[in-house]
């Protein structure tokens, strides 16, 4: 292997490890803050994430020029981005709320059903049909979650509803983005989209936070007095949320779609194992079996979609 090839391999490997670390890290830290630390403010936590994304996106694109700045060219394009921002907000808030009530392992199992909702919304909104064998691969995706739900000792109905809603919203945003920003003149890469979406999200979340979580400031200040690392944890958590988006963009840029798909599936499994080791939440054979069926269904769906285009 040549020196340049070795450097490229090392670079991509470092990217993937960093991507895994930031994604899994922010997930576990969210769970720790919301369930184990007494910080029960998922909407405010999401607003912190969006604030960090807004500031760091601006620095990365405008000052550091990591990617070229893409300008919004019309009021129509701005309204489309704002719509995506609200849907994106809903998915992140729903996911964070669910972490208050569900173990990370089960949260990831439900999140693995994203392809099912993506296929459903693609059909309902664009009438795009896949081959029947592709839809058939989605059966174990859903069946696995049903089985995992029955075998989950920490099952919580409200947490489950929020988690499934967040998963559906994430898929809806993906399909909606393909529809709204489909013309060449309006397409934005994920980093520029984050640059415009995150400040809109902060503006949308501020009144919701004040209404739904009115005591957030007083409780956070009290927690900060009790736990000296409170502000550091919040800051690190928010920066990691941005890093996860940046590294996702870089991994997508430097690897193939198939590699990204495989890495994404494996990432969920790694997150499950690490979360069980850290939080020591009880798991059952039925729960593990259900999650395994879901992951295999996701892999089969990706493969059939690739083959039967």
Swiss-Prot record:
It comes from the Eukaryota. The chain crosses the membrane at residues 9-29, 43-63, 78-98, 104-124, 131-151, 152-172, 193-213, 231-251, 256-278, 283-302. GO terms for biological process: mucilage metabolic process involved in seed coat development; nucleotide-sugar transmembrane transport. It is found in: Golgi apparatus membrane. Keywords: Golgi apparatus, Membrane, Pyruvate, Sugar transport, Transmembrane, Transmembrane helix, Transport. It is a multi-pass membrane protein. The keyword Cell wall biogenesis/degradation does not apply. One of its GO terms (cellular component) is Golgi membrane. Ubiquitous. Disruption phenotype: Changes in cell wall monosaccharide composition with a strong reduction of galacturonic acid (GalA), rhamnose and xylose content in the sead coat mucilage composition. UDP-glucuronic acid transporter that modulates the polysaccharide composition of seed mucilage. Transports UDP-glucuronic acid (UDP-GlcA) and UDP-galacturonic acid (UDP-GalA) in vitro. This is UDP-URONIC ACID TRANSPORTER 1. The gene is UUAT1.
